Amino acid sequence: MIYKVFFQASTTEVPVREHTDSLYVEAVSERDVRDKLKKHSYNIEFIQPVDGAFLDYERESENFKVLEL
């Protein structure tokens, strides 16, 4: 399954909504996503499963790229 991860790039700064970025990760569970991103210094805000019509919509975006971790 593909998950959309909303995160802040720095764990040392206070999270600000306007600075939230997102990325896509293929994993078997939310815990697997967190394990795969553990080595990165992301402040993870939310992990959302993406499937069905939502996945089709996200694929149309020019920013859609699933990370190979």
Swiss-Prot record:
InterPro entries per the record?
RpoY
Name of the top EC class for this enzyme: transferase
Q: What is this protein called?
A: DNA-directed RNA polymerase subunit epsilon
Molecular function (GO) terms listed? DNA binding; DNA-directed RNA polymerase activity
KW Ligase (keyword) present: no
Family note: Belongs to the RNA polymerase subunit epsilon family.
Presence of the UniProt keyword Transferase in the record: yes
What biological processes does GO assign it?
Answer: DNA-templated transcription
Keywords, in A-Z order: DNA-directed RNA polymerase, Nucleotidyltransferase, Transcription, Transferase
Q: Which NCBIfam families match?
A: PRK13667.1 (NF010188)
Which interval of the chain is the signal sequence?
Answer: none
- Coiled-coil region(s) at which residues? none
EC numbers for this chain: 2.7.7.6
Cellular component per GO?
DNA-directed RNA polymerase complex
Q: How does it assemble?
A: RNAP is composed of a core of 2 alpha, a beta and a beta' subunit. The core is associated with a delta subunit, and at least one of epsilon or omega. When a sigma factor is associated with the core the holoenzyme is formed, which can initiate transcription.
Reaction(s) catalysed by this chain, per the record, are: RNA(n) + a ribonucleoside 5'-triphosphate = RNA(n+1) + diphosphate
Top-rank taxon of the source lineage equals: Bacteria
According to its UniProt entry, what is the function of this protein? A non-essential component of RNA polymerase (RNAP).
**Encoding gene (name):** rpoY
Pfam (any one)? RpoY
